[in-house]
Amino acid sequence: MSQAQENEHAGPAVPQTRTARHRRIVDILNRQPVRSQSQLAKLLADDGLSVTQATLSRDLDELNAVKIRNNDGDLIYAVPSEGGFRTPRVPLGESAKEERMRRLSAELLISAEASANLVVLRTPPGAAQFLASAIDQAELHDILGTIAGDDTLLLISREPTGGQALADHLLRLAQNHH
């Protein structure tokens, strides 16, 4: 397989910057239990990010990562949540992430409009980034990415004409949440 073909299947390119590395560390720690720095280094290497133990230790310190006991009683790394909640918490399970997205959609979603593969969501002032974070963490396969301002989110559908179906889905979630 050529280098170009390998890159096609490798997923999105990850820049080798400190900020990108920090973002990837937070993503990993929020998605799965990580018990050691060596395990985290392996997971980063799997994503094409090679780091030394000293760099990883410094990164974890800069991210205010701590070890906490998860629901199974294991000590795992955790980072403070983004937004107002600064206390590190055990990562939410998939159903909890989806439920959080449903609940926040019901509370915050004012409207959803689509065009081609784009969806524009409106929220009350100051709430767009909060809802975008919940949508990102729910990891819906149909969503390629989100961009949030103060009261507006832009969602990008993976499908070229998937915007309307995605808008309808989010509106249904907001209306059907109990």
Curated annotation (Swiss-Prot):
Pathway: Amino-acid biosynthesis; L-arginine biosynthesis [regulation]. GO terms for cellular component: cytoplasm. Keywords: Amino-acid biosynthesis, Arginine biosynthesis, Cytoplasm, DNA-binding, Repressor, Transcription, Transcription regulation. One of its GO terms (molecular function) is DNA-binding transcription factor activity. GO terms for biological process: L-arginine biosynthetic process; protein complex oligomerization; regulation of arginine biosynthetic process. Residues 1-21 are annotated as: Disordered. It is found in: Cytoplasm. Its main location: cytoplasm. The keyword Amino-acid biosynthesis applies. Regulates arginine biosynthesis genes. Belongs to the ArgR family. HAMAP family: Arg_repressor. This is Arginine repressor. The gene is argR.
